């Protein structure tokens, strides 16, 4: 099986996001890479579910709270950008200040 560099990147995001989700479910706080991966995964899955870019950008500011991440993480993540595949093509989704 051949995977393009983009497909490999997405698989790494998914793997990190699944680990982050397990940690969230155990009540642990996410670090910076885990938070970015988890947010990115939510965008990818939302696009796959047929949600619009604007819906994802709006919802993306409510997925994680300051209480769910380690101290200092919200200040490090000013925006998350992820290319996601929508029914009408690939689009860039930007989450501005996603952890509030």
UniProtKB/Swiss-Prot annotation:
Its EC number is 3.5.1.5. Transmembrane segments: none annotated. GO terms for molecular function: nickel cation binding; urease activity. It comes from the Bacteria. It is found in: Cytoplasm. It catalyses: urea + 2 H2O + H(+) = hydrogencarbonate + 2 NH4(+). Gene3D superfamilies: Urease, gamma-like subunit. Keywords: Cytoplasm, Hydrolase. GO terms for biological process: urea catabolic process. One of its GO terms (cellular component) is cytoplasm. Pathway: Nitrogen metabolism; urea degradation; CO(2) and NH(3) from urea (urease route): step 1/1. The keyword Membrane does not apply. Heterotrimer of UreA (gamma), UreB (beta) and UreC (alpha) subunits. Three heterotrimers associate to form the active enzyme. Belongs to the urease gamma subunit family. This is Urease subunit gamma. It comes from Prochlorococcus marinus (strain NATL1A).
